[in-house]
UniProtKB/Swiss-Prot annotation:
Main location as per UniProt: cytoplasm
Name recorded for this polypeptide: Protein-export protein SecB
Superkingdom as given in the UniProt entry: Bacteria
Function as written in the Swiss-Prot or TrEMBL entry: One of the proteins required for the normal export of preproteins out of the cell cytoplasm. It is a molecular chaperone that binds to a subset of precursor proteins, maintaining them in a translocation-competent state. It also specifically binds to its receptor SecA.
Biological process terms in GO annotation: protein folding; protein tetramerization; protein transport
InterPro entries attached to this UniProt entry: SecB, SecB-like_sf
Subunit structure: Homotetramer, a dimer of dimers. One homotetramer interacts with 1 SecA dimer.
Lineage: Bacteria, Pseudomonadati, Pseudomonadota, Gammaproteobacteria, Alteromonadales
Localization, UniProt: Cytoplasm
Length: 163
């Protein structure tokens, strides 16, 4: 009976070990003058994710959000948050692991990062900022497609060069 159990594949395991703020910054380079003007901001959100293996089956995932609000030509505020998590992930295929690190984990981290950004903006006495949900699955699929297209292009160039 023990031999049968050892031969079966291990069930996938996913555990959140820790969620934490890795880095945080809020700047209002044109204050207090920016508070005297009519508030018609243009808000830009940039986000990035990265992951690193810490130990066997243990990974750190970092979600970086940069929110820039411009009022006319002037920067009203710049908010940067790096929300991180340590995740124990086991029993997944390489493709499933890549999806977990590139989409599932950032999806877990985003509400924490969104709350941090909202809190910083409020402390800067700016109007409430609600960041829309992000479809990390779609972003990850786009990233995979771009990598595949790049690999195919590189293979075609190599084939042309050897011909």
């Amino acid at each position: 009976m023990a031999e049968v159990a050892n031969n079966e594949q291990q069930d996938p395991q996913f555990n959140i070990q820790r969620v934490y703020t890795k880095d945080i910054s809020f700047e209002t380079p044109n204050s207090p003058a920016v508070f005297q003007k009519e508030w018609t901001p243009e808000v830009k959100l940039d986000l990035d994710t990265r992951s690193a293996k810490l130990a066997d089956n243990v990974f750190e995932v970092v979600l970086s959000l940069t929110v820039t609000a411009k009022n006319g030509e002037e920067t009203a505020f710049l908010c940067e948050v790096q929300q991180a998590g340590i995740f124990a992930i086991n029993g997944l295929t390489e493709q499933q692991l890549a999806h977990s690190l590139g989409a599932y984990c950032p999806n877990i981290l985003f509400p924490y990062a969104r709350e941090a950004v909202g809190s910083l903006v409020a402390r800067g006495t700016f109007p409430q900022l609600n960041l829309a949900p992000v479809n990390f699955d779609a972003l990850f699929a786009q990233y995979v497609n771009q990598r595949q297209a790049g690999a195919e292009e590189a293979a075609a160039k190599t084939e042309e060069a050897s011909a």
